[in-house]
Amino acid sequence: VYRIYGRVNRTEPGPPDPVPVTEDSPLRDKLYPYRGLDLPFPESEKQRLQDYDKIPIERLVMNDPAIQGTVLRLPAVYGPNDGQHRLFEFLKRMDDQRPAILLDERMAQWHHTHGYVENVAVAIVLAITDERAAGRIYNVGEAHPLPMIEWVRAIAKIADWHGNIIPLPSDRVPSHLVPDIDTRQDLLVATTRIRKELGYREPVDLDEALKRAVAWERANPPKEVDAKQFDYAAEDAVLV
């Protein structure tokens, strides 16, 4: 919902917003942000996203005096049943025993707040069961998000992969690995409010979360894989 999403997706041009954003930070001005975008999703999912936006629902709930509503703004949720398979692009390369994973040097330092699915579920239950949550808005996510290169290293540790992670200038990165976002804008959210007001703490630490996520991803790979996103010949040409 935040303007930083418009910045990173280039739908709301402007200088990068300061991060981490709080619950009081500016929201997107443009509603229905997925309309008109060529998204790498199945056609049914593309159609659903045409009318997808959380901001109108938030306004409806928070402005209705008859509803004791709570809004939770969730992070990039990973783990079992992750329909977006957030670990797959890295884990597949690791399991294919690639010698190296290439990252655009800008992407290597980019931050995005994640949340393991069970930890996010705990936050949801807490908001439902704690009366102090009524009428409040809370960001949910990990307390200390990693830059992308460290995120990949954390996955590699769990996957028992010992290759190299190589940041490269944009002009040397194969075209399928060039970021389609504005990496000057980090997607970092502050989760201080829910921790202070409701005492939220993650029951599953990062290592255990990634162990469970990697195990699920290996057992449940995507049914369709875009071969163009795994152009190993182009990646090998850079490594020579």
Predicted regions and their residues:
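A contiguous, mid-protein "functional segment" used to position or interact
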Residues: 1, 8, 195-227
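Conserved loop-to-helix N-cap of the C-terminal "lid" that shapes the substrate pocket in Rossmann-like
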Residues: 71, 111-121, 137, 145-149, ...
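Conserved catalytic-site region of short-chain dehydrogenase/reductase
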Residues: 1-33, 40, 77-80
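Short aromatic-enriched loop/helix-cap "lid" or pocket-rim segments at secondary-structure transitions
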Residues: 4-9, 82-85, 151, 177-180
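Active-site Tyr-X1-5-Lys
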Residues: 19, 23-71, 86
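NAD(P)-dependent short-chain dehydrogenase/reductase
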Residues: 64-111, 119, 154-155
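Mid/C-terminal beta-alpha module of Rossmann-like enzyme folds, strongest
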Residues: 123-186, 191-193, 211-212, 221-240
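Substrate-positioning beta->alpha
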Residues: 53-57, 84-90, 104-129, 135-136, ...
